[in-house]
A protein has these predicted regions:
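Short, histidine-centered active-site or binding-site loop motifs used for metal coordination
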Residues: 15-18, 50-53, 127
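Conserved AMP-binding/adenylate-forming core of the ANL superfamily
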Residues: 26, 35, 46-98, 115-120
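Short, flexible loop segments at the rims of nucleotide/cofactor-binding pockets, characterized by
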Residues: 22-25, 60, 108-111
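AMP-dependent adenylate-forming
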Residues: 9-11, 33-57, 176-180
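A short, structure-level motif marking secondary-structure boundaries and short turns
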Residues: 18-20, 53-54, 80-82, 103-105
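Flexible, non-catalytic linker and terminal segments flanking ANL/adenylate-forming cores
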Residues: 1-28
């Protein structure tokens, strides 16, 4: 195989370069790695979020990932679609990371400190079709900021958002189980 001049990188071929294999690197996908770990250590603790009173085994975590992945797919999100997560460290963030990988979606990690202009730019730049966010964190009122950017949300059916400032965004998913116009929970 031809190499790029001055490097050990191949021209064409695989989309990655495989270096030293000592110790051997896993070539498993994230979903396959989760499935293998659940099969090997299913009843052992996997996820602990004390602040949210969550303690899941590998089997429980894998089942929750499957449930969320199925939900994202049921929304019509397909391989390559972008899903934003605008959140501090919470179990929903971890769940989203694995569920988007399971479906083949691209998880877009949005900085929890972003304000209106930064959020608008990020969502439009990467073309998020969905965003998952809590109501608020510290002094940031996430859902209020989304409502400012997309006032159409108040009258939209979930999944039918047609916001002038966020033209690709269709789904707003609220982390808390509180019914909110235009949003899923």
């Amino acid at each position: 195989m031809a190499m790029q001049p001055g490097t050990s990188l191949p021209i064409g071929g695989l989309s990655y370069v495989k270096g030293s294999d000592t110790p051997p690197l896993s070539e498993l996908t994230v979903p396959a790695l989760l499935a293998n770990t659940a099969a090997l250590h299913g009843s052992r603790p996997a996820v602990v979020f004390r602040e949210q009173n969550i303690r899941w085994t590998w089997n429980e975590f894998s089942a929750e990932v499957d449930r969320m992945a199925a939900g994202l797919h049921a929304l019509g999100l397909r391989k390559g679609d972008r899903v934003g997560i605008w959140s501090p460290n919470r179990f929903e963030w971890l769940l989203t990371q694995f569920a988007t990988a399971r479906v083949g979606l691209v998880m877009v990690n949005i900085n929890p400190a972003y304000r209106l202009a930064e959020l608008e730019y990020a969502l439009n730049k990467v073309g998020c079709k969905a965003i998952i966010a809590p109501e608020a964190f510290k002094t940031s009122r996430y859902l209020d900021m989304l409502a400012t950017l997309a006032p159409e949300l108040a009258k939209a059916e979930p999944g039918a958002l047609n916001a002038a400032r966020l033209p690709l965004l269709r789904w707003v998913i609220r982390m808390e189980d509180v019914p909110t116009p235009g949003m899923l929970t």
